[in-house]
């Protein structure tokens, strides 16, 4: 019997919401009898945007904004049908992007 694995990648701008969501997924998977590896923190993506402060000239006066994308990886090993059903019903915050691979 081949071993199955569900790989879940989570992305969010707020690390606190991301960690709460990862904890909910881990608790749900463990409660239904699956083995869990993670959450593994992946490198944070940092996008920096530089704009001119003045609308016309003054090129030396600039302002920088950044947005950080935090990421986590969770592997669920040997999931049961009960695990998959519980993960589908799980309610997570709206600021978290979830990517699931079987």
Curated annotation (Swiss-Prot):
Gene3D superfamilies: Ribosomal protein S10 domain. InterPro entries: Ribosomal_uS10, Ribosomal_uS10_CS, Ribosomal_uS10_dom, Ribosomal_uS10_dom_sf. GO terms for cellular component: ribonucleoprotein complex; ribosome. Pfam families: Ribosomal_S10. GO terms for biological process: translation. Belongs to the universal ribosomal protein uS10 family. Part of the 30S ribosomal subunit. This is Small ribosomal subunit protein uS10. It comes from Thermoanaerobacter pseudethanolicus (strain ATCC 33223 / 39E) (Clostridium thermohydrosulfuricum).
């Amino acid at each position: 019997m081949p071993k199955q694995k569900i790989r879940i990648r989570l992305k969010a701008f707020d690390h606190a919401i991301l960690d709460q969501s990862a904890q909910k997924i881990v608790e749900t998977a463990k409660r239904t009898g699956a083995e869990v590896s993670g959450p593994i923190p992946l490198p944070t993506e940092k996008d920096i945007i530089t704009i001119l402060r003045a609308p016309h000239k003054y090129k030396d006066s600039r302002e920088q904004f950044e947005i950080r994308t935090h990421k986590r990886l969770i592997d669920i090993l040997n999931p049961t049908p009960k695990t998959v059903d519980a993960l589908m019903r799980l309610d997570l915050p709206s600021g978290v992007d979830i990517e699931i691979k079987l």
